[in-house]
Amino acid sequence: MHKEYFNTNDGCKIAFRSSLPLKEVTGVAPEKCVLLMHGFSGSSDYFIRNFASLSKSLWVVAPDMRGHGDSSQTRGGYHVARLAADLSGLVAHIRKTASVSIVPVGCSIGAAVLWTYVELFGCNDFAGFVFVDQAPLQDRSAFDGWDEIKAHTGCYDEMTMLAAQYNWINNSKKAHIDLAIGCLGYRCAPKEDDGISAEQQAKDEAFFTNISAKCDQTWLARLLADHTRYDHREAIETITVPVLVMAGRRSSCFPLEGMLESVRRVEKSRPGLARSSVFDSGHWLFYEEPERFNKEIAEFVNSC
């Protein structure tokens, strides 16, 4: 993977990985591009188990979102809508080099960025969408029966959000460890046949906590406040391209019922346009079940 950069319309430098160097893309890029969007406090490094396989048949692009990884940040900008505007800039940057069909894969907050993109810019830039382990609203809500059966399990109202912010700012190391434990299915809901050694568990924990530690924790806490309140349900109903929803059966972040709401919302007016795939893993299913993830992503992207 090649490291590339571009500048947003407000001067923020965004880093991204590309399976092809942009200066050599013209005439050699595959017709299909998969754009991998990481989750909260993550980076493009999250997809270390996916790059090689996906790049065999697809042009793979994976940004570090603003305030994450090797990307810079502004004093403000801690809003999902700003991240969606950054994505719009990345899409334009990619298309300067090649006219290509793009299917974005949004994991966790990456899915929220895509739903916000749909609300702001529509669907025309993309041939399809993949939403990975994220419900369209984290908070519980009095509207449309959105309670603990569908909302986030740990950050779902003002009190729990403030507690999460405090931990990210004041107990960052513990917050990073708790995130790793909660997002790896074999840690939060272990099974006898998982076969993950203690050594591998330690390596996985270090891998993810080191990525989270690169971020400005106060900036992240402010992004969290915006993210958890954002209700994307109606925006999802406007999607007009094929949708694949992936969810982890052992995810500690959301109940399956909440994550599968995206399928129901798309199909309210367009039956058959969306489908789901449930993995036997946690929130980071792309890391825990990479072979299945890579296969299903490649098949879906090539079908769009």
What are these regions (language model features)?
Residues 106, 110, 114:
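Gly/Ala-rich beta-loop-alpha elbow adjacent to hydrolase catalytic centers
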Residues 115, 125-171:
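Flexible "cap/lid" loop of the alpha/beta hydrolase fold
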Residues 104-106, 132:
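Short beta-strand immediately N-terminal to the catalytic nucleophile in serine-hydrolase-like folds
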Residues 278-294:
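Catalytic histidine-centered segment of alpha/beta-hydrolase-like enzymes
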Residues 140-141, 147, 163-238:
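Conserved alpha/beta-hydrolase catalytic His-Asp/Glu region
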Residues 238-281:
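Conserved loop-alpha-helix segment in the C-terminal half of the alpha/beta-hydrolase fold
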Residues 84-101:
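Conserved acidic catalytic loop of the alpha/beta-hydrolase fold
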Residues 12-76, 80:
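Conserved HGGG/HGGXW glycine-rich cap/lid loop of the alpha/beta-hydrolase fold
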